């Protein structure tokens, strides 16, 4: 499991296990409070639907949804019904081991996409034009990820 820790603006230490609804909520809070992300992602418009394939300690498929818009995260949902979000801008699919490797910095997200360890459905042109936003999103996610057990 991934143990997540970070300090909020008020100095409160929070922790959650990846993957969990609590982790996803902490990611939302961090995305909405990170000034660097807000600046870099100010022109991004696109929601993300993640499919995490079971592997290792994850025994069943997992999904989560993020609505990212102009440097903010407007909504997150853990284990959403895919029918509620029939046409997200991007669908990202990866095995549990590959997604945790990206979250811990062991696997570069661009390398993961190019080698199909992280599969992306949606406008690759848009994503490639917005590589700084993609990389900073990953940076924020990595900052809330402190260790893998």
Please state what every model-predicted region is.
Residues 4-149:
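Feature captures hydrophobic
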